[in-house]
C-alpha cells in the first residue's frame, strides 16, 4: 500500500473505521455507538489476522484491542497486529483499546507507534470520538499544508 491518502473520504465525507476486538459484545456496542454518527463507514473484525487481510480497504483509522486471544489462543495480539499494520502502512493511525489500567502497557503501545491508548470503560466511546476528531483535523490540516506547499 503506497501513499496514504489522509482521510480519502471515498464515501463522501465518511471516515473509514476498522474496529478490531475479540469481545463480540463490546465490539457490537462500539459499532452501534459509531453507527449513530453518519460520518463513519465501519468494518468490524474479531481477530488481528482478519484486520491485516483487509488493509487493502484503506481504513482511515483503526481501533484495535490489546489482547485479542479469546477466540483462539494462538491469535496475534494487539501489539503484533499493530506492528504488522505499521509494516504495511505506517501512516494509518491505530488507537489501542484495553481493559489494562497499567501505564507500562500504554507506554509499550506508544513505543510500537500507536496513535493513542484508551482504557475500556464507560467513557471509552467519548474518548475515541475525540481522538478520531483530532486525527481528522490533523490530517485535514496536513492535506491543506501539502496543497499550499505544492504551489510554492
Segments from the language model and where they lie:
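Non-catalytic signal-transmission and effector/linker regions of two-component phosphorelay proteins
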Residues: 1-18, 23-31, 145-152
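Two-component/phosphorelay signaling modules centered on CheY-like receiver
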Residues: 24-46
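Acidic, metal-coordinating helix/loop segments flanking the phosphotransfer/catalytic sites
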Residues: 44-61, 65-70
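Output/docking surface of receiver
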Residues: 46, 74, 110-130
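Conserved phosphotransfer cores of two-component systems
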Residues: 55-57, 84-91, 112
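Alpha4 helix (beta4-alpha4-beta5 surface) of REC/receiver domains from two-component response regulators
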Residues: 76, 80, 87, 100-118
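Receiver (REC) domain switch/output surface
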Residues: 127-140
